[in-house]
Amino acid sequence: IRDSPDSIHKIIEINAHRFKTGAVISDVCGVKSSVSESICSVLPEGVDYVGGHPMAGKEMDGFVNASSELFWMSGYIITPVKTSKKESVELIREIAKYIGSTRITIASPEEHDSVIAYTSDLMHIAASALCLSYPEKMNRAYTAGSFRDCTRVARINPKLWSELFLANRK
C-alpha cells in the first residue's frame, strides 16, 4: 500500500473483507510506528502485516514521473511488528530484492522512525528552509549544482509531507 499515513487505515478498513487468510499486507509509507499500529488494528484474523520502506524516491510523483530503475541499488527497510511471521518477512525481503534493492535492513517501526527523522525528515525541512530563505533579489545566475542538489527535495507534496512530519514528530 502506498498512500499517505492518514489514508492507509481507511484503505485497509474498507478493503479488509477482500483479504484472504494467509495474505501478507505491506505498506511503503515513510513513517512506521503509527501506520503499523493503525494497520494492525483493522487487519482481519489470519492476515499478516510487515511494514516496508524503500529508500528511494523522487520529488515529483505521479505516473508520468515513474521510473523502472527507481529502486535499483537502493536501500529497503523492513519493519516487522511482533506478530509478523518469519516467512512473511522473507517474502518482503524477496520483493525488495526483486525491485532492485540491495541494502536491506530489518528494524522495528520505532527504530525506523527515530533514524528517518534525521536521515530524511530533517533533510526535507532543511531544504525547504533554504528555499524559503532564498533572497528574492538574488538572481538564479548565482546558483549552480550545489544549490540545486540541496534544494531538490523541497519540491515535495506538501499534504503528504505534513502528514509524515506530524506522524514522526516524537
What is each model feature region?
Residues 8, 12:
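Aromatic/hydrophobic pocket-lining residues that form the small-molecule binding cavity
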Residues 64-70, 163:
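Short, flexible, solvent-exposed loop/turn segments with mixed acidic/basic and small polar residues
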Residues 13-64:
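Rossmann-like NAD(P)(H) cofactor-binding subdomain of soluble oxidoreductases
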Residues 68-153:
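Internal alpha-helical scaffold of NAD(P)-dependent oxidoreductase catalytic cores
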Residues 1:
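Conserved small/polar residues in nucleotide/adenosyl-binding loops
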Residues 155-170:
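NAD(P)-dependent Rossmann-like dehydrogenase/reductase catalytic/cofactor-binding core
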